[in-house]
């Protein structure tokens, strides 16, 4: 299966999880490509003065995994904007993951995953799974492994 892993990553954390997922999917016999959503301008809690530098195309992939950080207790505005501009995800399996700093899922992680799924479903995508990595957790490595295993098992 040809799987696109499309991420927005400010600090490199989300991108590092995407690379681990790519490695696992490739080892399972899939063609997996990591692509980055890139922006210029300002982005932060309450600040969304940015423009897209890169917006990866989704049409060539059989399935997609979207990854983004939580920012200000919500999905990063860059990923929210990127997903909104996609014309269609019809017929595509979709999974999502987020990385976050605060220690509880309810401090933005659940909301961000819900928003990603909502947007993807509105574009016709079939959301089949998700994961949250809490970067500040002492269990971070185990969380990454668990999310990568779970998402890889979907395809």
Positions of predicted regions on the chain:
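FMN-binding flavodoxin-like domain, especially the glycine-rich phosphate-binding loop
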Residues: 3-35, 46, 50-155
């Amino acid at each position: 299966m040809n799987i696109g892993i499309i991420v927005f990553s400010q600090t490199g954390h989300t991108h590092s999880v995407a690379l681990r997922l790519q490695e696992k999917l490739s080892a399972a016999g899939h063609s997996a490509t990591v692509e980055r959503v890139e922006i210029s301008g300002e982005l932060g809690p309450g600040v969304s003065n940015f423009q897209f530098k890169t917006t990866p195309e989704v049409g060539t992939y059989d399935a997609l995994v979207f990854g983004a950080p939580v920012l200000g207790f919500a999905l990063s505005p860059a990923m929210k904007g990127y997903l909104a501009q996609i014309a269609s995800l019809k017929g595509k399996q979709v999974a999502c993951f987020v990385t976050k700093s605060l220690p509880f899922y309810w401090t933005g992680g659940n909301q961000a995953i819900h928003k990603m799924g909502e947007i993807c479903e509105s574009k016709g995508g079939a959301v089949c799974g998700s994961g949250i990595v809490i970067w500040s957790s002492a269990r971070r490595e185990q969380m990454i492994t668990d999310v990568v295993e779970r998402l890889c098992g979907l395809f």
